[in-house]
Amino acid sequence: MKPDIHPEYRETTVICSCGNTFTTRSTAKSGVIHAEVCSNCHPFYTGKQKILDVGGRVQKFEKRFGQLTGAARVARSTGKPRAGRK
């Protein structure tokens, strides 16, 4: 390996927007990383389902395609349920 080509790996404080802070190691020069979501507030870890919608993408999709899935839309339009896959 070549000497002196790797960045310094130092102790870094991570600060989440929810207020949680923890220490890890990183190559960040400032020694501080600001995060929007951490394991304290992320829906996967907390069990709370909330949609992190950026720019109204979910509403735009629902407006364009409706809230029904493809199979439900076919069943609704024909009046009979659609057979599932095996």
Swiss-Prot record:
Pfam families in UniProt: Ribosomal_L31
Keywords per UniProt: Metal-binding, Ribonucleoprotein, Ribosomal protein, RNA-binding, rRNA-binding, Zinc
Residues holding Zn(2+): 16, 18, 38, 41
Domain of life of the native organism: Bacteria
Entry's Gene Ontology cellular component terms: ribonucleoprotein complex; ribosome
Molecular-function GO term, any one: rRNA binding
Names of required cofactors: Zn(2+)
Known partners and oligomeric status: Part of the 50S ribosomal subunit.
Functional description taken from the UniProt entry: Binds the 23S rRNA.
Protein name according to UniProt: Large ribosomal subunit protein bL31
Species per Swiss-Prot/TrEMBL record: Acidothermus cellulolyticus (strain ATCC 43068 / DSM 8971 / 11B)
Gene behind this protein: rpmE
